[in-house]
Amino acid sequence: MATTNVLATSHAFKLNGVSYFSSFPRKPNHYMPRRRLSHTTRRVQTSCFYGETSFEAVTSLVTPKTETSRNSDGIGIVRFLEGKSYLVTGATGFLAKVLIEKLLRESLEIGKIFLLMRSKDQESANKRLYDEIISSDLFKLLKQMHGSSYEAFMKRKLIPVIGDIEEDNLGIKSEIANMISEEIDVIISCGGRTTFDDRYDSALSVNALGPGRLLSFGKGCRKLKLFLHFSTAYVTGKREGTVLETPLCIGENITSDLNIKSELKLASEAVRKFRGREEIKKLKELGFERAQHYGWENSYTFTKAIGEAVIHSKRGNLPVVIIRPSIIESSYNEPFPGWIQGTRMADPIILAYAKGQISDFWADPQSLMDIIPVDMVANAAIAAMAKHGCGVPEFKVYNLTSSSHVNPMRAGKLIDLSHQHLCDFPLEETVIDLEHMKIHSSLEGFTSALSNTIIKQERVIDNEGGGLSTKGKRKLNYFVSLAKTYEPYTFFQARFDNTNTTSLIQEMSMEEKKTFGFDIKGIDWEHYIVNVHLPGLKKEFLSKKKTE
């Protein structure tokens, strides 16, 4: 069933280290290329056909180009996207879905996008495609564009492939793997386990070794032009000062004492030793301990760092781009403002505050909340693909962050804006008199204040001991654990260098900046938090509540 479906569709920390490769110019074409029309040209021609634009407006677009207009072509993003096919992991995740939507909406002549999915059979994979992507509200602009042919278009372009990043050859059946390897131009590594306190064995298998398995598959792809991997800006571990856009290599900016096989052995021994709930608890603790031992905050950033190092060591001559976003939150503009899937890093705290569950937290109000909207991350990735997808074997890192600019978002400002919005527009109909959140500089002060809040609000006093009830203790432990997990971010003071990212923006034409813009300097943080992100977050929360 799987083979028939897919085959049928195929026919329709040295901190100041440097990258080992530089960017080389493309060789000039020695033939007369067919003329490709920009989005502006297409739109004006269409408007003229329907009587909305004058003939002169169209003819002005097709007059011979001057030297100045030639230089305005920018990177050539739309030209690069035409006819390209992709293999995407993590396709049903928050970031990947936004990226897929953008590719489908902006590239009229896109090839196929193969989506690696864990499913028991092709029917289940097709159902996941429909339930999690095709029917998602995120794709409503595409639905408007294609009308009644929307589903047919999506099923023609999006091909679910049964596989698993934790298996050799990605767990794809050989005949399907062979077919895909003949078609794809770009691999987009977007999958991963994002829980900060994940069990160590799972985080190692997916985040550390998964990219290597994907890279090995890519080396067998005949016309692969680029391997693009999404990492995290916090991948460099505990740092102060400026975090540069440099590759991670074991023996250079990752200690040579780190032995991946030894870490896997430790995790395997823990799995054999513990069972049930004890197993999960011990494996989470092991991940935290190993990350701390090597200088990382948690098992997520630690295993993502190993994953980057694996890519760097195994890449060979394959062109590689690493995208390192900071805290990805809801869309700024596209496909519409405020779209979010699930809750991101700061959101559980905001929602708990909105529901009146907490009015205190542990943080430094001056710490940098390095937030970046998801649509800007997608746009940057597309621009980087076009820039580096010419087959030149270079290794480029891009920090997609906001703290390097003059107006970074700080924790205190985020709290102030959240209080302002939630007082004016409460989360639910129940009126809660929200106090301004009190920020504590010590964990002890936060724990004491939260304990008093729980006693006061829920009246869960143990009659015998005068302390918290079992329910109250669980609530206290949950929020204290959350505060500890977020401590590296709520007390973050380093700034991320984004020289490479700035250079990429400068190479883009004006039209490319309008269509694929990701200049963080243009973000109005007050507008984004109050009018975009919080309304989007509330909408997501209420929609999830209805389905529960």
UniProtKB/Swiss-Prot annotation:
Membership in a protein family: Belongs to the fatty acyl-CoA reductase family.
The protein, known as: Fatty acyl-CoA reductase 6, chloroplastic
Transit peptide (first-last residue): 1-47
Disulphide bridges: none
Purpose: Catalyzes the reduction of fatty acyl-CoA and -ACP (acyl carrier protein) substrates to fatty alcohols. Triggers the accumulation of C16 and, to a lower extent, of C18 fatty alcohols; converts palmitoyl-acyl carrier protein to the corresponding C16:0 alcohol with NAD(P)H as electron donor. Also triggers the formation of some C16:0 and C18:0 aldehydes. May be involved in the generation of C30 primary alcohol.
Lineage: Eukaryota, Viridiplantae, Streptophyta, Embryophyta, Tracheophyta
GO cellular component, one term: chloroplast
Intervals of motif NAD(P)H-binding: 86-96
UniProt cross-references to Gene3D superfamilies, sorted A to Z: NAD(P)-binding Rossmann-like Domain
Active site per the UniProt annotation: 300, 304
InterPro entries referenced in this protein's UniProt entry, alphabetically: FAR, FAR_C, Far_NAD-bd, NAD(P)-bd_dom_sf
Stored CDD domains: FAR-N_SDR_e, FAR_C
Tissues and organs where the protein is expressed, per its UniProt entry: Highly expressed in stems. Also present in flowers, leaves, siliques, pollen and roots.
Molecular functions per Gene Ontology: alcohol-forming long-chain fatty acyl-CoA reductase activity; alcohol-forming very long-chain fatty acyl-CoA reductase activity
Pfam families: NAD_binding_4 (PF07993), Sterile (PF03015)
Reaction(s) the record says it catalyses: hexadecanoyl-CoA + 2 NADPH + 2 H(+) = hexadecan-1-ol + 2 NADP(+) + CoA; hexadecanoyl-[ACP] + 2 NADPH + 2 H(+) = hexadecan-1-ol + holo-[ACP] + 2 NADP(+); a long-chain fatty acyl-CoA + 2 NADPH + 2 H(+) = a long-chain primary fatty alcohol + 2 NADP(+) + CoA
Source domain of life: Eukaryota
EC number, UniProt record: 1.2.1.84
Places the protein is found: Plastid, Chloroplast
Organism: Arabidopsis thaliana
Disruption phenotype: No discernible phenotypic alteration in the growth and development.
Keywords: Chloroplast, Lipid biosynthesis, Lipid metabolism, NADP, Oxidoreductase, Plastid, Transit peptide
UniProt induction comment: Induced by wounding in the epidermal layer of mature stem internodes.
GO biological process: lipid metabolic process; response to wounding
